[in-house]
Amino acid sequence: MIHIDIESDIEYKDVSLNLIVDHINGEAKYTKQWCKDNKGDFPVYSANNNEPISYINHYDYDGEYLTYSKNGCAGYISIINSKFSINGDRCVMSINSDYKDRIDILYLKYYLEPIFRSNKKGRLGDLGKNEFTKLNSTMIKKLNIQVPIPITSDGTYDLEKQKEIANKYKQIDEIKQGLIEKIKSLVEIKVVPSGE
């Protein structure tokens, strides 16, 4: 289906996420002990979106990939661009060859993450703490997500427009992160009354 965003005059074509990517589950064998026994220089990512759990002596992926957490704080998407592996708490979305140079990975991340987060299942934490939610590839496939891809006047995917939209979302994200850091520093300020 093709539709036009009236406000921005951008024409879009809806494409099924199930056509765009393959979901590849991580290896359950990459436990902390296994990683300890096979130490090396290549990161292994788990449910945590910020830091690898360990470094091992080989890698399963080499390049830029979308990955998402399946357990814990499920549905957050990270872009990893290196030689790396993932364990069973994470999934890689590999862009299929038909879409490889036609879909911007950052555009896909910003479009998908709110959908993933709104479809997670499990225990939500209080005030963003102690969340334990799940979202696996089977759940995502069943959603049959339609991704609106900007197209040019001749109907081809508009990679530049995707990048432009993604960069606007990235700027908003960076502003939000800056505000969060400022709020954290304000909360930590201790006011000591002077001895009057």
What residue ranges belong to the model's regions?
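Long, highly charged amphipathic alpha-helices
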Residues: 107-111, 141, 164, 168
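A short glycine-rich beta-alpha junction/loop motif
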Residues: 84-91, 124-153, 159-160
